[in-house]
Amino acid sequence: MRQRDITTQFGALTLVEEDDHIVQLNWGASGRADASPVLDAACAQLTAYDAGTLQAFDVPMRVQGGALQQAVCTAMRDIPFGETLTYGDIARALGVSAQAVGQACGRNPIPIMIPCHRVMGAKGLTGFSGAV
């Protein structure tokens, strides 16, 4: 796996690439600056997103996990910039419980790029993995 650190308004982040796909975005720095076209593209897109000039990421990403994890991450990627859904909205669309959706959101391996921050509880913001 290749890794590269990037500093954003969200803090220090580490991108992890495996087999030409981003597979993780971790909070904090790893101290690594591996070379990779996918990491180059992901860093450029995160920088543009951070600057407010990008609204959707198109670098190749792969979510590791079961069918529910993959379905929830796909649903999160489909939420347009500037919009939000509730855990219940996604749960109804997938035919699962809101709690299961919340747990899958909490296990999002690529936060920011897979926008779990666009998913809220029925009464507003709940349980973030980042510094919110």
What kind of region is each of these model predictions?
Residues 1-96:
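Basic nucleic-acid-binding alpha-helical/helix-turn surface characteristic of O6-alkylguanine DNA
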Residues 106:
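Residue-level detection of the helix-turn-helix DNA-binding "recognition helix"
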Residues 112-121:
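Short Lys/Arg-enriched helix C-cap and helix-to-coil transition segments
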